[in-house]
């Protein structure tokens, strides 16, 4: 297995195990992390805290990787995240109280691995889908 692929796989495993210390080992000190909601973070502590905030809010949360592309030091995962929203989630604007709903949605994560550490992590998912499944936005109107 390619080094970048191994590190990316271990990152998913650490996330699914809710293993904060392992995530800290896998991320570079100066990792650049981006996510929907205009989230732009620099540094291991901030990136791991973002992940842990989701895992605290979704205590049974995890991701299933459906496909993976490896190109040099880049790894792309297409995944599905699901979990039960049983604790508050800190959003970019405000805290979202627990809804006790179980959203499930697809996303893409683009990781760059350098010197055996995740140097960049760019996360993409449909915020409207998540908020709708949590009951915080109305269902979109049917096309027609």
Where are the predicted features?
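C-terminal and inter-domain tail/linker signature
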Residues: 1-144
């Amino acid at each position: 297995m390619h080094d970048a692929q191994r590190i990316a796989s271990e990152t998913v495993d650490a996330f699914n195990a809710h293993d904060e210390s392992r995530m800290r080992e896998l991320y570079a000190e100066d990792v650049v992390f981006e996510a929907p909601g205009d989230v732009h973070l620099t540094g291991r502590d901030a990136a791991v805290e973002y992940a842990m905030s989701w895992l605290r809010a979704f205590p049974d949360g995890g991701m299933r990787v459906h496909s993976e592309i490896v190109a040099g030091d880049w790894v792309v995962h297409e995944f599905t995240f699901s979990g039960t929203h049983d604790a508050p989630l800190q959003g970019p604007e405000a805290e979202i109280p627990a809804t006790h709903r179980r959203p499930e949605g697809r996303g893409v994560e683009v990781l760059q691995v350098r010197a055996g550490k995740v140097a960049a992590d760019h996360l993409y998912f449909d915020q409207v889908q998540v908020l709708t499944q949590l009951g915080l936005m109305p269902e979109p109107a049917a096309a027609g």
